[in-house]
UniProtKB/Swiss-Prot annotation:
It catalyses: Thiol-dependent hydrolysis of ester, thioester, amide, peptide and isopeptide bonds formed by the C-terminal Gly of ubiquitin (a 76-residue protein attached to proteins as an intracellular targeting signal). Specifically inhibited by spautin-1 (specific and potent autophagy inhibitor-1), a derivative of MBCQ that binds to USP13 and inhibits deubiquitinase activity. It comes from Gallus gallus. Zn(2+) binds at C206, C209, C226, H239. Residues 331-860 form the USP domain. Its EC number is 3.4.19.12. It comes from the Eukaryota. This is Ubiquitin carboxyl-terminal hydrolase 13. A zinc finger (UBP-type) spans 182-290. InterPro entries: Papain-like_cys_pep_sf, Peptidase_C19_UCH, Ub_carboxyl-term_hydrolase, UBA, UBA-like_sf, Ubiquitinyl_hydrolase, UBP13_Znf-UBP_var, USP_CS. One of its GO terms (molecular function) is BAT3 complex binding.
Length: 862
């Protein structure tokens, strides 16, 4: 029996009996794909090799994972799996006809792989030919397919099923199935009162009580009332239901769920959630204009195209001949359909040396220790993406001159231009409703989602996300007593407000607005756009100014009072990410983007924003929590518990709710993270979203004397004062030892915010608290084990230093809303700016630094 050439086409000729005998030992390992099995026959699990690649793709006949030539041996050594289906697409030059031209087009029966055609090759001159064969390791015996007569039936069936399997990235019916809602019988004939009610886009409150969550807008009279145990499991005082019983007005829409695609509507009469086919008209009656929010099929609104043509041209540097860039670090990424937000963020992330070292530098170790299914491992997919972008393997210049010189009928070996992040996107977004869709997303939200995953999946001794982390000192002052409270929280992004009132071209803006309105009334073409010019210094000043705290509860007065909050940097990050807060909502509920030009500096110094702590003469607010309030109607399944009325940061709650999370889950996230901000609460949501009570109402049990005292800490405690495990986990995730977290929570009556203050005020305990703390870790905390083992005792992992920075990258957005438009990334590499526009990577001639959305700065060494 002759041995085939390694990875070659030298398969041995053998009789039918020999083939059957050869495959007998491997028959138990060969499986036929079933419904629900993911078959990866177009992409390697460790690289971006495909059947188009020179070495083709090897698909395991047991796990259905695909591997390129470079990685197939690794899978064989790890699993012992021997039988693979080798897939290869060949590019053949067409044979010219008698007249000298190519033969007429005909259906190619030799194409059976679901692959895209190479756009660099003309279909008139070249054609494709697909090849499939079985390869048996370790001797690399090759068996050409089809071979029905000689192969066992199981092998033939398995091979055919694998070749005909659908892409794993298409949603399967069981995963995408949702209960189909029926149109309400009241929708078509709903009577709406002409009472002049207009609903603002925020600041809602039940008209019969003080509840600010789980609010429902009655579509007949515009009443805003709280719900009680509706279809989503949310709770309240039931005023919406009482209103229906009094008036008979049947339909209500839940505030916070209104999007361009619809809203959650409930029918009190039909006692179930329903569809309202006329929801846009019904909401418009109260000033909520959804029709203007509708998104076109191509993902762009009509009003994205005409008024902002100049924005698209400037950001993409249209009209300028840009030189394509190739090689390591200049690899483009395919747009999978509104995935430009992901492409832009990942290009910026892998331009940072710490991420390059963590994933690409550790690539052999990450791949060798990857799980049996590497497509479901975060670090493996990060390393794969980083290598794809930085290796230069998928960014090679076209070889047209060599193409012409090729001999007739010789096989052409095309170069792969760019990578398709399909596997990466499928994994990183699988548990996120928005990111798993094909809708456009906010790049800032995706950045935070990515950082959260990096935090939860440590790699090596250093966490690369540490370079973004910094501490924010928040000084809250009671305006009446003048007493203050200092707290610290972790953040990753500096959110910079747009100081529109500081525009330097106000006269031009006023004149433009008048011309625009005149043109609109006369149905003429709009005038040339005039963009507001905002000084960066004004935005920085707006960031540093005090802001009002709504519903502030003063512990000095033990009552609600006016309060103001000021933020400063308790530490400066190694890499500063600055988000320009361009997106907002108008009074008509239409999401708007502030079309501004900000003179972002190449060199930035924010040293003056360094936090100073408690100042001489300042008096701190007492450590007293708000009182417990017993609900009006405790007759529900939680009737034995009390609901604590707390000072929950509603702005953080709404920010999370706008991402698509249930409102009650957002309230719990903000509550359990001690009002430390939306970013910290977002991490809590990701960590708890699989729990069955994720969307249940926030109910804090109070036991024994705690209830009678009238005062309880954040997260009321049991008789033994044992801290809640989720609070312990939050502190551990910030880099502290478990024993120190428990000690701090017990010392502060389980008040998370005060516990962090306590830790910072007891540095001597951090030094004493060392390795022995690792021995008391519960098995439930295995997800934090690596982080805890690597954490040092100095507190949250920060890389403090001078507050002087240099700009090295920015992400720009084109369009009027984060729900539509397009993202582009500019990065400074090797002394020059480069534009990354999906697959197109070119040297930038005029980087539009004044129109960016997210900016990346690196610290200037002192």
């Amino acid at each position: 029996m002759q041995r085939a050439a390694l990875f070659g086409g030298g398969d041995a000729q053998m009789a039918a009996g020999d083939l059957g005998e050869l495959l007998v030992p491997y028959m138990p390992t060969i499986r036929v794909p079933k419904s629900g099995d993911r078959v990866y026959k177009t992409e390697c699990a460790f690289s971006y090799d495909s059947p188009d690649s020179e070495g083709g793709l090897y698909v395991c006949m047991n796990t259905f994972l695909g591997f390129g030539r470079e990685h197939i041996e690794r899978h064989y050594r790890k699993t012992g799996q021997c039988v693979y289906l080798h897939l290869k697409r060949h590019v053949i030059e067409k044979v010219p006809g008698a007249s000298g031209g190519a033969l007429p087009k005909r259906r190619n029966a030799k194409l059976f792989l679901d692959l895209e055609a190479n756009g660099d090759l003309s279909s008139d001159d070249f054609e494709y030919e697909d090849e499939a064969k079985l390869v048996i390791f370790p001797d690399h015996y090759e068996i050409s397919l089809p071979n029905i007569e000689e192969l066992p039936a199981l092998v033939t069936i398995a091979s055919d099923a694998l070749l005909s399997a659908k892409s794993p990235y298409r949603k399967q019916d069981p995963d995408s199935w949702e209960e189909e809602l029926q149109a309400s019988k009241h929708a078509k004939s709903l009577v709406q009162l002409d009472n002049g009610v207009r609903i603002p886009p925020s600041g809602w409150k039940c008209s019969k009580c003080d509840l600010r969550e789980n609010l429902w807008l009655n579509l007949t009279d515009g009443s805003v009332l709280c719900g009680k145990w509706f279809f989503d499991g949310s709770g309240g005082n039931g005023h919406a239901m009482e209103h229906y019983k009094e008036t008979g007005y049947p339909l209500a829409v839940k505030l916070g769920t209104i999007t361009p695609d619809g809203a959650d509507v409930y029918s009190f009469d039909e006692e179930e959630p329903v569809l309202d086919p006329h929801i846009a008209k019904h909401l418009a009656h109260f000033g909520i204009d959804m029709l203007q929010m509708q998104v076109a099929e191509n993902g762009l609104r009509d009003n994205d195209i005409k008024p902002r043509v100049s924005e698209w041209e400037v950001i993409q540097e249209a009209g300028v001949k840009l030189k394509p860039m190739y090689g390591p670090g200049y690899t483009g990424m395919k747009n999978l359909g509104n995935s430009c937000y992901l492409n832009a963020v990942m290009q910026a992330i892998f331009s940072i040396p710490e991420f390059q070292r963590a994933y690409v530098g550790n690539l052999p170790r990450i791949f060798d220790y990857s799980p049996l299914d590497p497509t479901q491992d975060f670090n493996t997919q990060m390393a794969k993406l980083g290598h794809g972008l930085l290796s230069g393997q998928y960014s090679k210049p076209p070889m047209k001159s060599e193409l012409i010189e090729q001999v007739m009928k010789e096989e052409h070996k095309p170069q792969q231009n760019g990578i398709s992040p399909q596997m990466f996107k499928a994994f990183i977004s699988k548990d996120h409703t928005e990111f798993s869709s094909n809708r456009q997303q906010d790049a800032q939200e995706f950045f935070l989602h990515l950082i959260n995953l990096v935090e939860r999946n440590p790699v090596g001794s250093e966490n690369p996300s540490d370079v973004f982390r910094f501490l924010v000192e928040e000084r809250t002052q009671c305006c009446q007593s003048r007493k203050v409270r200092y707290t610290e929280r972790v953040d990753y992004i500096m959110q910079l407000p747009v100081a529109m009132e500081a525009a330097t071209n106000k006269d031009e803006l006023i004149a433009y607005e008048l011309k625009r309105r005149e043109a609109e009334a006369a149905r003429r073409a709009p005038p040339e756009l005039v963009r507001a010019k905002i000084p960066f210094s004004a935005c920085l000043q707006a960031f540093s100014e005090p802001t009002n705290v709504e519903d502030f509860w003063s512990s000095a007065l033990q009552a609600k009072s006016a309060g103001v909050k000021t933020s400063r940097f308790a530490s400066f990050p190694q890499y500063l990410v600055v988000q320009i807060k361009k997106f907002t909502f108008g009074l008509d509920w239409i999401p708007k983007k502030l079309d501004v030009s900000i003179d972002m500096p190449d060199f930035l110094d924010i040293s003056h924003l360094r936090a100073m702590g408690l100042q001489p003469g300042e008096e701190e607010l007492p450590d007293i929590a708000p009182p417990i309030i017993i609900p009006e109607d405790p007759k529900d399944r939680m009737m034995n518990n009390f609901v604590e009325s707390l000072d929950i940061d509603e702005s953080s709650v709404m920010q999370l709710a706008e991402m698509g999370f249930p409102l009650e889950a957002c309230r719990k996230a903000v509550y359990y993270t001690g009002n430390l901000g939306a970013e910290v609460a977002f991490n809590w949501i990701i960590a708890h979203m699989e729990e069955p009570d994720f969307a249940e109402p926030l109910v804090v049990p109070v036991f024994g004397g705690a209830a009678s005292s009238g005062v309880a800490g954040l997260g009321a405690v049991g008789l033994d004062n044992q801290p809640p495990e989720e609070m312990v986990s939050i502190i551990i995730s910030m880099g502290f030892q478990r024993s120190l977290a428990i000690q701090a929570l017990k010392a502060t009556n389980n008040n998370l915010e005060r516990a962090l203050e306590w830790i910072f005020s007891h540095p001597e305990l951090e030094e004493e608290d060392g390795e022995p703390a690792l021995n008391v870790m519960d098995l439930e905390n295995h997800t934090n084990a690596n982080i805890l083992a690597e954490a040092r005792s100095e507190g949250p992992r920060i890389k403090d230093g001078p507050g002087r920075y240099e700009l090295f990258g920015f992400i720009s957005h084109m369009g009027t809303s984060t729900m539509s438009g397009h993202y582009v990334c500019h990065l400074k590499k090797e002394g020059r700016w480069v534009i990354y526009n999906d697959l197109r990577v070119c040297a930038s001639e005029r980087p539009p630094k004044d129109l960016g959305y997210i900016y990346f700065y690196h610290r200037i060494p002192s």
